[in-house]
A protein has these predicted regions:
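Membrane-embedded transmembrane alpha-helical bundles that form the catalytic cores
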Residues: 1-240
Length: 240
């Protein structure tokens, strides 16, 4: 479900409307989490299990990295995060490429049988949430971030549907504090109630409209020509 489709627009407006009507912050947390999982399930069905795996892996690995006393253990845990996440990404994204190279090699050494392609569908957003969760564990490893104490909040960070299709990749240190931000003037937590500022809302709508315009009138019209060039780069130059 791309962000410039009517399905996404309807889904987004529905979520935003409920978000505005019910102003309890705890409700917002659970609602955003359910919306994110629903978005992934709608797009990928059973492949949502990969998202859940990444969430659980890096949430608990991040905690263990933070508690680790030796650099060796920290590195081992970070490697576990990298292997777990990049292994899944590589399997879905490059398995057929690896099989093709193996079959080519098999032809050179006269192997009679070739390995059939898996033809796996690439799970939506897997590149974004893979590197997003990796950045979380890397920041903890470097001492730039403390691990989240809430699995719910970490899951919201990873499954935040508005950016998972086309990015950008979120950083936990920028996103997680917003879930429990303070009202500076009143010095009270916004955990229970949230208000939607009209100015911020208008700016957000204007920026989204500008993004839709750029996508539909520029990117979508330029893409066919660019794709043709990338499909046959031999003999072409930068000024072609």
């Amino acid at each position: 479900m791309l962000f410039n489709t009517i399905e996404f627009v309807i889904f987004f407006i529905s979520i935003l409307s409920i978000f505005i009507i019910f102003k309890n912050r705890k409700f917002h947390h659970y609602f955003l989490l359910v919306a994110g999982f629903l978005f992934f399930y709608w797009s990928n069905n059973y492949l949502i299990t990969l998202l859940i795996f990444s969430i659980l892996l890096d949430f608990y690995v991040g905690k263990e990295i933070f508690k680790a006393k030796t650099i060796t253990r920290k590195k081992s845990l970070l490697i576990l995060s990298l292997v777990g996440n990049l292994g899944l990404l590589g399997f879905f994204k490059y398995s057929d490429f690896a099989i093709a190279q193996f079959n080519i090699l098999g032809n050179y050494i006269n192997l009679t049988d070739s390995i059939p392609f898996l033809n796996l569908a690439l799970p939506i957003g897997i590149s974004f949430y893979t590197f997003q969760t990796i950045s979380y564990t890397v920041d903890i490893y470097r001492g730039q971030l403390k691990p989240s104490n809430s699995l719910r909040e970490f899951a919201i960070f990873v499954a935040f549907f508005p950016q998972i299709v086309a990015g950008p990749i979120l950083r936990a240190k920028d996103f997680l504090p917003q879930l429990n931000e303070k009202m500076e003037k009143l010095k009270i937590s916004k955990l229970r109630l949230i208000t939607l500022e009209k100015t911020s809302f208008r700016i957000g709508v204007a920026m989204m409209a500008l993004g839709f315009f750029k996508k539909m009138f520029f990117a979508d019209n330029i893409a066919p020509m660019v794709n043709d060039i990338f499909a046959m780069p031999v003999g072409l130059e930068s000024f072609t």
